[in-house]
């Protein structure tokens, strides 16, 4: 096969596949966006946030508002000790 013909074939294939792949990835992105903003996902995110806050408050022995007043270095020392 001639090199120039192979190059033309590859360029045409790239031009044809690029819109097809773009449509495929946009559908995946739309589905992920709908799933992320769904009521179930919002409920799970809020539960995870509350669990993280409770873990930190139990670990450092302070309420979340008190934990906000602790300097970062002391906060990290308490978490990893």
Swiss-Prot record:
<feature type="signal peptide">
    <location>
        <begin position="1"/>
        <end position="22"/>
    </location>
</feature>
<dbReference type="GO" id="GO:0044179">
    <property type="term" value="P:hemolysis in another organism"/>
</dbReference>
<keyword id="KW-0812">Transmembrane</keyword>
<keyword id="KW-0295">Fungicide</keyword>
<keyword id="KW-1052">Target cell membrane</keyword>
<keyword id="KW-0964">Secreted</keyword>
<comment type="function">
    <text>At high concentrations, acts as a pore former in cellular membranes and causes the leakage of the cells. At submicromolar concentrations, degranulates granulocytes and has a weak hemolytic activity against human erythrocytes. Also strongly inhibits the production of superoxide anions. Has a strong antibacterial activity against Gram-negative bacteria but is less active against Gram-positive bacteria. Also has antifungal activity.</text>
</comment>
<keyword id="KW-0044">Antibiotic</keyword>
<keyword id="KW-0204">Cytolysis</keyword>
<keyword id="KW-0813">Transport</keyword>
<keyword id="KW-0732">Signal</keyword>
<dbReference type="Pfam" id="PF08102">
    <property type="entry name" value="Antimicrobial_7"/>
</dbReference>
<dbReference type="GO" id="GO:0005576">
    <property type="term" value="C:extracellular region"/>
</dbReference>
<feature type="propeptide">
    <location>
        <begin position="66"/>
        <end position="81"/>
    </location>
</feature>
<keyword id="KW-0354">Hemolysis</keyword>
<comment type="similarity">
    <text>Belongs to the non-disulfide-bridged peptide (NDBP) superfamily. Long chain multifunctional peptide (group 2) family.</text>
</comment>
<dbReference type="GO" id="GO:0006811">
    <property type="term" value="P:monoatomic ion transport"/>
</dbReference>
<dbReference type="GO" id="GO:0044218">
    <property type="term" value="C:other organism cell membrane"/>
</dbReference>
<dbReference type="GO" id="GO:0042742">
    <property type="term" value="P:defense response to bacterium"/>
</dbReference>
<keyword id="KW-1053">Target membrane</keyword>
<dbReference type="InterPro" id="IPR012526">
    <property type="entry name" value="Antimicrobial_7"/>
</dbReference>
<dbReference type="GO" id="GO:0050832">
    <property type="term" value="P:defense response to fungus"/>
</dbReference>
<protein>
    <recommendedName>
        <fullName>Probable antimicrobial peptide Con13</fullName>
    </recommendedName>
</protein>
<dbReference type="GO" id="GO:0016020">
    <property type="term" value="C:membrane"/>
</dbReference>
<keyword id="KW-0472">Membrane</keyword>
<keyword id="KW-0929">Antimicrobial</keyword>
<keyword id="KW-0406">Ion transport</keyword>
